[in-house]
UniProtKB/Swiss-Prot annotation:
GO molecular function (one): trans-2,3-dihydro-3-hydroxy-anthranilate isomerase activity
Alphabetical list of Gene3D superfamilies matching this protein: Diaminopimelate Epimerase, Chain A, domain 1
Xref: PANTHER family: ANTISENSE-ENHANCING SEQUENCE 1, PHENAZINE BIOSYNTHESIS PROTEIN
Keyword annotations: Antibiotic biosynthesis, Isomerase, Virulence
Active-site annotation: E45
The EC number(s) this enzyme carries: 5.3.3.17
Organism field: Pseudomonas chlororaphis (Pseudomonas aureofaciens)
Protein name per its UniProtKB record: Trans-2,3-dihydro-3-hydroxyanthranilate isomerase
Pathway: Antibiotic biosynthesis; phenazine biosynthesis
Length: 278
């Protein structure tokens, strides 16, 4: 038998945010079994906690219903919050395929209510398929250069002129499915408050409630293009249009040619617990 918890990540109340199933003590499971379990759970991601291979507190493997991911934001934040219930430590180091990710845990009345992570520093380049992407999104232009960031997942960013325009998006998901191995992040806002929507048929996600791995790159994107200062924390609200409001905080420190830290944080709550017989 294997025990699991479901954490609603980037949420302050159950049934908000982005859910992740976290399986503990998964060392006896094969990669094939993990993939089949993730398909059975049918959430956007499921994580498996294994004994560390290096100097971390645990090794984490992340699966969507269709493939394994080297890194993902909301699954790792949810996993850190789940593991925090089993330790008094205020810091956790979780090993992933993209390296060891450091977490700071925030507690209230003894319970972990939030976590912050140091994300991998991404690389970026122009997408080069702007016209095709804009047509798939049903819009004529982007308010920012369309660029793709890579920090494990690959995230494309498209700017919208207003929150209303962002909410009105109705993408052609069949056309978006031709953008292989990438997620399309559309955003709007100003100052420190931004809204986002993420579409990724290529990753098996029609629309994501909270894309933590895109939050850090969005902060970089905004700073690189003069909308915020490097080191300034922003709020990113996502999932509103699908009834799963999710609040993320992100900050990129350094400068465009020498980033020193990418931090993403948010709350999380336990939604449920269970056991599988396997």
């Amino acid at each position: 038998m294997h025990h699991y918890v479901i954490i609603d990540a980037f949420a302050s109340a159950p049934l908000e945010g982005n859910p992740v199933t976290v399986f503990f003590d998964a060392d006896d499971l094969s990669a094939t079994q993990m993939q089949r379990i993730a398909r059975e759970m049918n959430l956007s991601e499921t994580t498996f906690v294994l004994k560390p291979r290096n100097c971390g507190d645990a090794l984490i493997r992340i699966f969507t219903p269709v493939n394994e991911l080297p890194f993902a934001g909301h699954p790792l934040l949810g996993t850190a919050i789940a593991l925090g219930a089993h330790t008094d430590n205020h810091r956790l180091f979780l090993e992933t395929q993209m390296g060891t990710i450091a977490f700071e845990l925030e507690r209230q009345n003894g319970s972990v209510v939030a976590a912050s992570m140091d994300q991998p520093i991404p690389t970026w380049t122009a997408l080069g398929r702007d016209v095709e992407l804009l047509k798939a999104l049903g819009i004529s232009d982007s308010t920012f250069p369309i660029e793709i960031y890579h920090n494990g997942p690959r995230h494309v960013f498209v700017g919208l002129p207003s929150i209303a325009a962002l909410s009105a998006l109705h993408p052609d998901h069949r056309a978006l499915s031709s953008f292989h191995d990438m997620a399309i992040n559309c955003f709007a806002g100003a100052g420190r408050r931004w809204r986002s929507r993420m579409f990724s048929p290529a990753y098996g996600v029609v629309e994501d409630a909270a894309t933590g791995s895109a939050a850090g790159p969005l902060a970089i994107h905004l700073a690189r293009h003069g909308q915020i200062e490097f080191g300034q924390q922003i709020e990113i609200l996502q999932g509103v249009e699908i009834g799963r409001p999710s609040l993320m905080f992100a900050r990129a420190e350094g400068r465009a040619d020498q980033l020193t830290r990418v931090e993403v944080s948010g709350n999380g709550v336990t939604f449920g617990r269970g056991t599988i017989v396997l």
